[in-house]
């Protein structure tokens, strides 16, 4: 869960983020874009993965090492009229990454949801279940392989990890484990 995570919401959330970052914001709910925040000299301040989670609500992910820098910087530029609300989700939201040539096969074992390429395109996010845990699966990762970031309430972290590890052993030609 080594990411900084926050939600920006409110009637002017889109307008605010459009001002704050370079690159286009995702327009459709469930879409993701990689956006860069620029400093006053036009250099890159930080990089954010931004997902539109609802109308007037965006979920932002950045490097965990930049938590204070990024969150303080966002709040510095927020309008003071209450039209934009910042919510730090770093401690309440966990993230596990599943990536590699058998990532889809593993995800199909731990979830009843459809992880096919046709149903789950690059730079999209969907609410799914892993075991009994609610997960926002984001089809994005930066390791050069097929994969998903699994964003979830932190109280489900151990369950999701255990489910992935239990089923990981059964992604080859071995017999399926009935617990997966």
Residue ranges of each PLM-predicted region?
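Single conserved hydrophobic/aromatic residue that forms the stacking wall/gate
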Residues: 170-180
């Amino acid at each position: 869960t080594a990411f900084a995570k926050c939600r920006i919401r409110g009637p002017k959330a889109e307008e605010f983020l459009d001002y704050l970052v370079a690159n286009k914001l995702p327009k459709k709910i469930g879409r993701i874009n990689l956006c860069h925040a620029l400093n006053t000299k036009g250099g890159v301040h930080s990089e954010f993965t931004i997902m539109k989670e609802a109308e007037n609500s965006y979920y932002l992910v950045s490097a965990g090492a930049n938590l204070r820098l990024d969150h303080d910087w966002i709040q510095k530029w927020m309008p003071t009229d209450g039209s934009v609300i910042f919510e730090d989700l770093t401690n309440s939201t966990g993230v596990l990454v599943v990536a590699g040539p058998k990532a889809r096969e593993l995800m199909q074992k731990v979830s009843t949801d459809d992880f096919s390429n046709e149903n789950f395109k690059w730079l999209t996010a969907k609410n799914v279940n892993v075991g009994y845990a609610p997960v926002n699966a984001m089809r994005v990762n930066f390791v050069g392989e097929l994969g998903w970031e699994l964003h979830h309430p932190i109280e489900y972290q151990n369950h999701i990890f255990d489910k992935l590890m239990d089923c990981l052993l059964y992604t080859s030609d071995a017999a399926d484990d009935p617990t997966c």
